[in-house]
Swiss-Prot record:
<keyword id="KW-0138">CF(0)</keyword>
<dbReference type="InterPro" id="IPR035908">
    <property type="entry name" value="F0_ATP_A_sf"/>
</dbReference>
<feature type="transmembrane region" description="Helical">
    <location>
        <begin position="80"/>
        <end position="100"/>
    </location>
</feature>
<comment type="similarity">
    <text>Belongs to the ATPase A chain family.</text>
</comment>
<keyword id="KW-0813">Transport</keyword>
<dbReference type="Pfam" id="PF00119">
    <property type="entry name" value="ATP-synt_A"/>
</dbReference>
<dbReference type="InterPro" id="IPR045082">
    <property type="entry name" value="ATP_syn_F0_a_bact/chloroplast"/>
</dbReference>
<feature type="transmembrane region" description="Helical">
    <location>
        <begin position="173"/>
        <end position="193"/>
    </location>
</feature>
<dbReference type="InterPro" id="IPR023011">
    <property type="entry name" value="ATP_synth_F0_asu_AS"/>
</dbReference>
<feature type="transmembrane region" description="Helical">
    <location>
        <begin position="106"/>
        <end position="126"/>
    </location>
</feature>
<keyword id="KW-0406">Ion transport</keyword>
<comment type="function">
    <text>Key component of the proton channel; it plays a direct role in the translocation of protons across the membrane.</text>
</comment>
<protein>
    <recommendedName>
        <fullName>ATP synthase subunit a 2</fullName>
    </recommendedName>
</protein>
<feature type="transmembrane region" description="Helical">
    <location>
        <begin position="21"/>
        <end position="41"/>
    </location>
</feature>
<dbReference type="InterPro" id="IPR000568">
    <property type="entry name" value="ATP_synth_F0_asu"/>
</dbReference>
<keyword id="KW-1133">Transmembrane helix</keyword>
<keyword id="KW-0375">Hydrogen ion transport</keyword>
């Protein structure tokens, strides 16, 4: 039976940095997406071809999804959320390529992504409201609730990391068990399950990040200004 590691396999060290298979795969995915973005954006024309039409449709769909949640700041948030979706979808599905494992089944990778979302929530919140106005929402409706606000920030970050890790790991285990039990009769259904689950998990992670960012942007005095 294939051994499934719950953490990254260490390949070596580059100075103080530990180089793991998950780190290399994550860098590879980011590099491929960056290169593809650079190539495809250079091909933009006034009369779009089929590829450009599809890409513009994807961008428009992502922008509309973000605008439905954050109508006041969707232009600033859309690039971040779309980057998350693209990275996670590619990272979740790269294990379909022989010789690669999905980096999102490594808890250190999902934790890094959750921490990125954590800081992004505060970054967008401070940009929209200002530092003092943003920090005030931690003291409302009563300063006594400050510890609970802080605990909530930490626990939802942990939950975001563990949820993605757990779902991707369970998908790998279920696929392996089905292959062991069914042999050659189940490869295609397992592949379809992997594709669907990988895309769904990428979408859910991005939506949760979007909701958290919306909460950071819309918290505090701004809500009072828009109330009748």
């Amino acid at each position: 039976m294939e051994q499934i590691d719950f953490f990254a396999r260490v390949l070596g060290h580059l100075g103080p940095v530990t180089v793991s298979d998950s780190l290399l795969t994550s860098v590879l995915v980011a590099g491929l997406l960056s290169a593809a973005s650079a190539v495809l954006t250079r091909r933009r024309t006034a009369l779009p071809d089929r590829v450009q039409v599809v890409l513009e449709g994807i961008v428009s769909a992502c922008e509309n999804a973000v605008r439905d949640v954050i109508p006041t700041a969707y232009r600033e948030v859309t690039p971040f959320i779309m980057s998350l979706w693209l990275f996670l979808a590619t990272a979740n599905l790269i294990s379909l390529v022989p010789g690669f494992d999905s980096p999102t089944r490594d808890l250190s990778v999902t934790s890094a992504l959750a921490v990125l979302v954590f800081f992004s929530v505060h970054w967008f919140g401070i940009r929209q409201q200002g530092l003092s106005a943003y920090l005030k929402h931690y003291l409302t409706p009563n300063p006594v609730l400050l510890p609970f606000h802080l605990i909530g920030e930490i626990t939802r970050t942990l939950a975001l990391a563990i949820r993605l890790f757990g779902n991707m790991m369970s998908m790998e285990l279920i696929g392996l068990l089905l292959l062991i039990i069914g042999g050659l009769f189940v490869p295609v259904p397992v592949l379809l399950l992997h594709v669907v689950e990988g895309l769904v998990q990428a979408y859910i992670f991005g939506i949760l990040a979007l909701v958290y960012i919306a909460g950071g942007i819309q918290s505090g005095p701004q809500q009072e200004n828009h109330s009748p």
